């Protein structure tokens, strides 16, 4: 990493939220910045003018050439694959390539609690942040959610704490990143269109711990085989959590109680049925949050209060409204089959499920088995509609409706739902075939449902 960015030539690839934040930050550090994107993203009025006024040169609709004479450093946004030509050219030329997470870490003075995993990252990151805030700590919550870390890290000092949601894409370009506490919630199939194999995907998640030492902590899910297996390569102190079995040390559930035992001191945190979050998967998220909080020295009575008050975050099993006796649940963040399975398992009522979108190389067979077990009707849409319907039929599930668009999907679900049912949006797919983000998808779902409620 460059030690001084004054007059250094930096190419930032990817003009999304992360790329914009990196560009603004490096210009303030005296760098000459070119922000490039293969597409031409839509920005709010005045955004491009503000960037150019700040000194950022824009290259939208294509990438500039990369050579040692024109570029000293390449910063890749997490959404951009490392196989794009400017990155490959930089590697060939020996030009350093990094990402926003690594860059932010370079300027960080605060201890970091970093959370990764296939599912549950945002909920767990937000919960840990609330635990620290309630304990009186000055806390930044960011990374893959909220503000990019690079935009905020210099405002926080050694006595503060940073809680970061970290994706596999961000970890790909992390070389010296060293969180005080690293959390891996689970590793199930996702993003295989980018990582290729589960082995590659797990290895990328393991980069979380590559630079940790004996004074750091690795929080791992004992119930998830791939996550638990990461212990073999960890040099820091491992804290396991489990909702299925009792542990000699770590955080687990015993007799309906959340129990923590670190350094030989066992204590009850709270009852598991006191949690403000629905679903067994959210119990796992809470156990991980307890483990991270205990690693940072938070007292149990303080964190127990937060566990009771915390009601979750938007687009994750978010209750929207009850219309004509039917409850509508927004789980737009259920962007892979495992997340949608966990959503289906969270409810005992009859479910009308809305699923479909852009496939990320997923296998829908296990998801289809859960659909047969839990759903009364499946409404499919988007690029993956046929694949999901085919998988469901292979399991003997025939009550399938096809929707041409998102609004039609919600209206079809409403038509077949009866009082006491749940209409659940948990797509098991990404949103990019129809929306810019899962947030946009979830917001439209809420808008449609609330319009139905108004009549």
Curated annotation (Swiss-Prot):
The keyword Glycoprotein does not apply. Pathway: Cell wall biogenesis; peptidoglycan biosynthesis. It is found in: Cytoplasm. Transmembrane segments: none annotated. InterPro entries: Mur-like_cat_sf, Mur_ligase_C, Mur_ligase_C_dom_sf, Mur_ligase_cen, MurD. One of its GO terms (biological process) is regulation of cell shape. Its EC number is 6.3.2.9. GO terms for cellular component: cytoplasm. One of its GO terms (molecular function) is ATP binding. It is an enzyme of class 6 (ligase). Belongs to the MurCDEF family. This is UDP-N-acetylmuramoylalanine--D-glutamate ligase. It comes from Pelotomaculum thermopropionicum (strain DSM 13744 / JCM 10971 / SI).
């Amino acid at each position: 990493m460059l030690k001084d960015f004054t007059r250094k030539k930096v190419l930032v690839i990817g003009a999304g939220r992360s790329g914009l934040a990196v560009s603004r930050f490096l210009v303030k550090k005296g760098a000459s910045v070119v922000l490039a994107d293969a597409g031409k993203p839509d920005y709010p009025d005045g955004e491009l003018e503000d960037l150019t006024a700040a000194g950022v040169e824009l290259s939208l609709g294509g990438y500039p050439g990369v050579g040692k004479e024109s570029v000293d450093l390449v910063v890749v946004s997490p959404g951009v694959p490392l196989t794009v030509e400017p990155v490959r050219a930089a590697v060939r030329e020996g030009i350093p390539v990094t990402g926003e997470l690594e860059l932010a870490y370079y300027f960080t003075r605060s201890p970091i609690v970093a959370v990764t995993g296939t599912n549950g990252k945002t909920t767990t990151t937000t919960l840990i942040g609330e635990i620290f805030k309630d304990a009186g700590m000055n806390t930044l919550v960011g990374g893959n959610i909220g503000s990019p870390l690079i935009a905020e890290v210099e405002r926080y000092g050694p006595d503060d704490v940073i809680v970061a949601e970290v994706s596999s894409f961000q970890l790909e370009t992390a070389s010296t990143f060293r969180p005080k506490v690293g959390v891996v919630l689970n590793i199930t199939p996702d993003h295989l269109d980018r990582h290729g194999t589960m082995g590659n995907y797990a290895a990328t998640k393991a980069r979380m711990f590559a630079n940790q030492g004996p004074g750091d902590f690795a929080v791992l899910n004992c119930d998830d085989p791939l996550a638990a297996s990461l212990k073999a390569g960890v040099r820091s102190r491992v804290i396991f959590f489990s909702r299925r079995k009792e542990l000699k040390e770590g955080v687990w559930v015993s007799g309906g109680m959340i129990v923590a035992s670190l350094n030989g001191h066992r204590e009850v945190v709270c009852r598991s049925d006191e949690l403000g979050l629905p679903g067994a998967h959210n119990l796992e998220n809470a156990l991980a949050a307890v483990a991270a909080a205990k690693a940072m020295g938070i007292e149990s009575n303080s964190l127990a209060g937060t566990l009771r008050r915390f009601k979750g975050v938007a687009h994750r099993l978010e209750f929207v409204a009850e219309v004509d006796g039917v409850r509508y649940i927004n789980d737009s963040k259920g962007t892979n089959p495992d997340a949608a399975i966990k959503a289906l398992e969270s409810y005992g009522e009859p479910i009308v499920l809305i699923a479909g979108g852009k496939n990320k190389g997923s296998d829908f067979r296990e998801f289809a088995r859960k659909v047969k077990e839990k759903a009364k009707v499946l409404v499919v849409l988007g690029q993956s509609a046929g694949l999901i319907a085919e998988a469901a039929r292979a399991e003997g599930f025939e009550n399938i409706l096809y929707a041409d668009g998102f609004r039609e999907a919600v209206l079809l679900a409403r038509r077949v739902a009866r009082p006491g049912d749940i209409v659940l949006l948990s797509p098991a797919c990404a949103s990019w075939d129809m929306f810019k983000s899962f947030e946009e998808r979830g917001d439209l779902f809420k808008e449609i449902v609330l319009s139905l409620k108004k009549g």
